[in-house]
Design a protein with these regions (language model features):
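A conserved catalytic-core segment of Leloir-type glycosyltransferases
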Residues: 3-4, 40-145
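Conserved donor-binding/catalytic core segment of Leloir-type glycosyltransferases
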Residues: 211, 252-277, 402
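Carbohydrate-associated surface elements
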Residues: 216, 238
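Nucleotide-activated donor-binding/catalytic signature segment of Leloir-type glycosyltransferases, i.e.
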Residues: 300-320
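Short alpha-helical donor nucleotide-sugar binding micro-motif in glycosyltransferases
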Residues: 319-320, 327-332
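Aromatic "clamp/platform" in nucleotide-sugar-dependent glycosyltransferases that forms part
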Residues: 340
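Short hydrophobic beta-strand element within catalytic cores of glycosyltransferases
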Residues: 357-360
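Conserved acidic donor-binding segment of nucleotide-sugar-dependent glycosyltransferases
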Residues: 373-382, 390-395
Length: 429
């Protein structure tokens, strides 16, 4: 069989990313390239510095529409503006989101949505007009599907499911939707956004195969979305392995550092990290706790830290990117991911790659592939505090976790994950 050609839809691609989704897209593309699969990667707005050696990058903002666009404005007259909540813009700084929302409302309904030569202009961000961009991106997908040759369609997360559906209808080629997270993870049972849930469900139903990043997510897809089990396949995420353990930096303090790195939202369980920190401080005062990230629970947690008397031992850094993330790992003695519902969780792999002993919640996909991280129930702050204390108090345990964890993540390669995807492609072609 000839090498497969995949038309892939994704909202972001390194080096300009906002979180784990873009990192995963790059890892998958790199792995597919090593396995002989040619990737056409369609993103809303390319910057020109993406890695073109692993995928042909198609900038949706540069695609001249083939369809008649006269009815687009009529369509939007019947769509009420919906403010996108922070749970739908998971990697956008709250201040940036507010600024974009205000700018969008200021510009009003009559701004031009089609530019010269029938090209849509995308921001490629998670801003207040996100739903509008999702719709326009799907229209562009129809043009791309007519213009390029490919064998299979692969759509990453709910933002691109509609694009995948349209590409399938136009081309007749099989569709795979890749579930990196669900609305149940973001909003829980009673706080989910019904519009996003409907988009997710429609995408899963239209797909020929549904790929999930963990068995944890697979069970949610089957039970909460009603997707037949035989249609849903788990392909665990991996990590771009880089030897980072020799890159420790002088941090200027002797205190131990325990780090939470992620969105400060309900899904990520930051309040359990704060409560566990208070318990650890009663047993070991020479510890500092760092919460690196942003989100709607940040201000309440700042107040809670003050109530607990942790103000001088607890630090909020805001959202970190790129080298700042790696520097934070280099400073850390323990990394904690206490997520309430985590589809996978790449950050623990990155921490362990950096030689940081790691604690994760049992309610996570990454718990399925790690043996050398301590696993606790997200709600059990006593167990979490004990785990943090144990790593800090017993150097032998810390060194064991560093060594074994480092070796373990070295085996979780994107090339292996992508080989599973290649096999799925070939089963559908």
């Amino acid at each position: 069989m000839k090498n497969a050609r995949v038309l892939m839809f994704g909202w972001e691609f390194p080096p300009h990313i906002s979180g784990g989704l873009g990192t995963a897209c790059l890892g998958i593309a790199q792995g597919l390239a090593k396995n002989g699969v040619k990737v056409l990667f369609v993103m809303p707005k390319a910057s020109g510095d993406e890695d073109g050696s692993v995928a042909k990058i198609i900038n949706a903002s540069d695609v001249e529409m083939l369809q008649n666009t006269e009815k687009i404005e009529d369509f939007w007259k019947h769509i009420n503006f919906m403010e996108i909540g922070s749970n739908l813009v998971p990697y956008l700084d709250p201040e940036t989101f507010a600024r974009e929302r205000d700018q969008y409302l200021k510009e009003g309904e009559h701004r031009q949505r089609i530019s010269y030569h029938n090209k849509f202009q995308f921001s490629g961000k998670y801003g207040a007009n996100l739903m509008e961009e999702v719709y326009r991106y799907a229209l562009v997908a129809g043009t791309v599907a007519k213009r390029y040759e490919f064998d299979v369609i692969h759509a990453h997360d709910w933002l691109t499911y509609s694009a995948g559906i349209i590409a399938k209808k136009i081309s007749g080629k099989p569709l795979i939707v890749h579930v990196h997270a669900t609305e149940y993870d973001r909003g829980g049972e009673y706080n989910r956004n019904t519009l996003v849930y409907d988009i997710e469900k429609r995408g899963m139903e239209a797909a020929d195969r549904v790929v999930t990043v963990s068995n944890w997510t697979r069970n949610i897809v089957i039970e909460k979305y009603g997707i037949p089990a035989e249609k849903v396949i788990t392909v665990h995420n991996a990590v771009d392995f880089k030897a980072e353990t020799d890159a420790k930096e002088e941090r200027g303090i002797k205190d131990k550092i325990v780090t939470f790195l992620g969105r400060i939202t309900l899904q990520k369980g930051p309040e359990y990290f704060v409560e566990a920190a208070a318990k650890v401080m009663k047993r070991m005062p020479n510890v500092r706790f760092v919460m690196a990230g942003s989100g709607e629970k940040m201000n309440p947690l700042v107040r809670r830290v003050a109530q607990l008397g942790l103000g001088t031992r607890f630090h909020f850094t805001g959202f970190l990117r790129g080298n700042d993330v790696q520097r934070m790992f280099q400073y850390s003695d323990v990394y904690v991911m206490p997520s309430v519902s985590e589809p996978f969780g790449i950050s623990p792999l990155e921490a362990m790659r950096s030689g940081v002993p790691t604690i994760i919640s049992k309610q996570s996909g990454v718990a399925e592939v790690l043996d050398h991280a301590i696993k606790v129930d997200y709600w059990d702050i006593n167990a979490l505090a004990d785990a943090i204390y144990g790593i800090l108090a017993y150097p032998t345990l810390a060194h064991y976790m560093q060594r074994e964890g480092y070796d373990e993540v070295n085996k979780l390669k994107w090339e292996n994950a992508s080989l599973k995807l290649k096999n799925i492609y070939e089963s559908l072609i």
